[in-house]
C-alpha cells in the first residue's frame, strides 16, 4: 500500500503588492492554518518519506509550519509551481518504487485536479491548506484515473 498526500499551500499575504506571486509569504491566518493542519496530521501518525514541492515562498513556509523542525526530505521542483495535472503526475511517476509515502505541496488548481483525477471523487473546493490523503496499491509510475482511494480530505475550517 502506498500513501499519497496533496497539501495546498496555506493562505498567502497580499500586504506587499510589489512582491512577485512566487515571493509572497504566508498571511497570519495562513501560518495559523499550517500549524493547525500540521497538528492534525501528526495526530494521524502518518509517515512521509519524501515531499515534492513548489519552491515558492508560501509553499516553503507552509512546509515549515506544517512539520515544524521535523520535515522529511523535500525535493523542490519548479514544475510544481503553476503545474498542470501532467506536471504533478510526472513528479510522482519519478518517485523511486521503494518510497511508500509521498506528499505533494503545491498550488491550485493542480492539487484539486490531481486528487479528483486519481480518486474520481468530486471535491467541491480545495481550500488553502486543504489536505487530501490517498491510498493506492499501484506503483508510482502506474498511477492513473481512479487508481487511488480517498482516505480523507481535511480543511482548516473544520479544525478551527
Predicted regions and their residues:
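Non-DNA-binding regulatory cores of transcription-related proteins
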Residues: 95-98, 103, 108-129
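Active-site catalytic microenvironments for nucleophilic, acid-base chemistry
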Residues: 40, 65-69, 94, 117, ...
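Hydrophobic packing residues within well-ordered alpha-helices of enzyme cores
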Residues: 62-66, 88, 114-115
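Active-site-proximal alpha-helix that buttresses catalytic centers in soluble enzyme cores
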Residues: 2-3, 7-79, 83, 123-127, ...
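A polyampholytic, Gly/Pro-enriched intrinsically disordered region
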Residues: 93-105, 146-156
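Domain-level recognition of soluble alpha/beta enzyme cores
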Residues: 122-153
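Short phosphate-binding loop-to-helix
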Residues: 80-96
Amino acid at each position: 500500500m502506498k500513501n499519497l498526500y496533496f497539501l495546498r499551500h496555506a493562505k498567502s499575504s497580499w500586504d506587499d503588492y510589489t512582491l512577485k506571486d512566487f515571493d509572497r509569504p504566508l498571511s497570519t491566518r495562513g501560518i495559523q492554518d499550517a500549524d493547525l493542519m500540521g497538528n492534525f496530521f501528526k495526530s494521524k501518525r502518518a509517515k512521509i518519506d519524501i515531499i515534492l514541492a513548489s519552491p515558492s515562498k508560501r509553499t516553503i513556509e507552509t512546509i515549515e509550519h506544517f512539520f515544524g523542525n521535523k520535515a522529511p526530505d523535500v525535493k523542490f521542483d519548479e514544475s510544481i509551481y503553476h503545474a498542470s495535472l501532467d506536471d504533478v503526475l510526472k513528479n510522482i511517476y519519478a518517485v523511486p518504487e521503494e518510497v511508500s509515502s509521498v506528499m505533494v505541496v503545491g498550488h491550485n488548481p493542480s492539487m484539486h485536479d490531481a486528487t479528483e483525477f486519481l480518486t474520481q471523487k468530486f471535491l467541491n473546493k480545495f481550500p488553502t491548506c486543504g489536505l487530501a490523503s490517498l491510498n493506492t496499491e499501484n506503483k508510482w509510475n502506474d498511477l492513473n484515473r481512479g487508481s487511488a482511494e480517498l482516505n480523507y480530505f481535511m480543511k482548516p475550517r473544520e479544525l478551527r
